[in-house]
Amino acid sequence: MKSGFSNTYFYYPLPDYKLPLHIYSDKHLPKDAKGWKPYYVPDSSTLIADESKLYEDIIKNNVFEFFANSFLVECSIDSREMGEIEFAILHSDRQEKYRVGTTINKKKEVHCIPLNSASKEHLLHLYENSLKMVGRGLNIVPLKLQGDKLEMSFMGYPTMEELILDAYRNKEINKIEELFDTLLKQIEMGAIEAKKENNILYELNIDKGDSKIFYGKILKTAYIDMLPRNCFMKDGLLFWFDQEWKLENIPSKYILYRAIHFLYMENPWIDEVLERRELIKRYNIQDCEESFYTLEVMFYSSVVVDKNTFFAKNTFGNGGLKEQLTNLLNFFDKRNGGK
């Protein structure tokens, strides 16, 4: 006599099943630790082991399934029709109105969905941003709006980030610089320049209008998620996706700074190939970096953390940045249909 389920399919939610941000499966396992966002721990010295430092090796040694914090299982005794969804990203750590998710099913169909009724408008902004990028001469991953979800074409090509990291592994400095040059050209392609005095950094009181810092081109409209991770590369052409955020009067070099910042933060080993400061210097960002970092922290906090919680934690530790954050929240709401 046999017992048990004859068919099973495992899912692996990260960081765990209670508040998942990424959900992998037997057919789609992580290639790196980018999906790993551990819970906030006030005092890391209390940890027996820092999971964030272990996951890269766990993945490389093909033991992710064994060490996953949680798993979900589909079970069946008479059906093999399981594993409909192969991978999902859930932006459930954001404010409610920005919570969207992306799924890839076994037919390789990609769907972007609102995680609640409040975030339907944000999904519509993503769609509109993509269409406007086409008007600037940029290529996008084909997509269409179907009811409350976006359907996108699956592209089995490497992302620009994967190609950049390959260049770091092979120590191809010229290729690294060439790819970042291409990125900056794409960021500025078809964009209308705004007046220098309209710089968002002045409007948010991050810097003063009479500042001697040269911020480069100020774009009247900018898509700040034009990062290497958000585009596929095919035959030398870039195809953009997941362009959720549009802001006005943004220095083009701020978006390039974001690309460099995230790449080096998530892949610290690349600094041994080409130092971060050298790349920052190549694009004359060194004098802008402090202002860009302030804007980045403010933007991130306005999206991910509820402003009351943010202020209560006194994250920045000074009243000046609290005032700046309030300015950004008001500014950002206006640009997205708020009061």
Where are these regions (language model features)?
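ATP-binding glycine-rich loop module of kinase domains
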Residues: 91-131
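Short alpha-helix
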Residues: 1-12
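Conserved structural core of kinase catalytic domains
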Residues: 140-207
